[in-house]
């Protein structure tokens, strides 16, 4: 995911430091998780506690860190005959999504040309809205477990930057269409590493959470500036 401060390219460097100085550690706490890339990576070796005050980050954590095995979506298969929710959303023709009510088109009404902005194309915004509403409908109808729900939300969130018309943050959009926006929006098939440990994800103020949990390794990667990350 393209996100300010993402540490994906530094994971091996962080691992080198961790294994050099904390050889006997059993747990790893990522108190400002962001894209959850660090916690997701260290789940291979540790029981992971992840946290972020931003709810989108919490969804990424719940869907890939606290969730300890790839969801099967058994109820969606049995009740709806949909073998793969990701294939269902990714392969559906955009014209089939036009039945979605206007009041449920949050992304199209606020972040596409139909809403006077150019963060997303109209068609990709509609694809996001359709998937988001359908996931909520399935959850309401008890067709999704908690892990399945958050996995799908995480898969949706992870796909948005790949079609967004931005330079790096959502503070502003390009005044022309970037080449990536021509691609069809797709939910991302996210890996889920099974470590059979009690991994936990939180959506709290990190300074307060540290008073309630304990662990061996504390990884701190706080915000870099005073600007709120949510608008980005």
Language-model features: locations:
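Residue-level recognition of the N-termini of beta-strands and the immediately preceding loop/turn
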Residues: 26-27, 148, 152, 199
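Short, basic, glycine/proline-bearing loop/turn elements
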Residues: 24-27, 187-197
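Short, contiguous clusters of charged residues that form electrostatic/catalytic patches at enzyme active sites
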Residues: 9-16, 126-133, 204
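Conserved proline-anchored active-site loop of SAM-dependent methyltransferases
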Residues: 14, 28-41, 50-55, 215-231
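S-adenosyl-L-methionine
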Residues: 1-32, 37-45, 58-60, 67
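Class I S-adenosyl-L-methionine-dependent methyltransferase module
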Residues: 47, 51-193, 226-232
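Conserved SAM-binding strand-loop segment of SAM-dependent methyltransferases
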Residues: 198-205
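Short conserved loop adjoining the S-adenosyl-L-methionine
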Residues: 208-214
């Amino acid at each position: 995911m393209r996100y300010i401060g993402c540490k994906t390219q530094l994971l091996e460097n962080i691992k080198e430091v961790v294994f050099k100085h904390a050889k006997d550690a059993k747990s790893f706490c990522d108190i400002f998780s962001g894209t959850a890339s660090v916690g997701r990576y260290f789940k291979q070796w540790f029981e992971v506690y992840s946290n972020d005050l931003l709810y989108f980050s919490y969804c990424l954590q719940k869907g890939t860190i606290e969730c300890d095995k790839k969801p099967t979506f058994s109820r969606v298969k049995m009740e709806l005959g949909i073998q793969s929710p990701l294939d269902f959303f990714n392969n559906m023709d955009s014209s089939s999504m036009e039945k979605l009510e206007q009041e449920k088109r949050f992304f199209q009404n606020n972040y596409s040309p139909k809403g006077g902005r150019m963060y997303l194309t109209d068609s990709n915004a509609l694809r996001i809205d359709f998937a988001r509403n359908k996931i909520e409908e399935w959850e309401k109808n008890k067709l999704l477990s908690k892990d399945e729900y958050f996995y799908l939300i995480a898969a949706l969130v992870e796909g948005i930057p790949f079609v967004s018309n931005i330079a790096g943050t959502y503070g502003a959009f390009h005044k022309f269409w970037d080449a990536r926006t021509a691609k069809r929006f797709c939910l991302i098939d996210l890996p889920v590493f099974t470590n059979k440990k009690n991994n936990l994800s939180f959506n709290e103020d990190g300074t307060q959470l540290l008073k309630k949990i304990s662990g061996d390794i504390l990884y701190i990667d706080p915000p870099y500036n005073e600007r709120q990350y949510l608008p980005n």
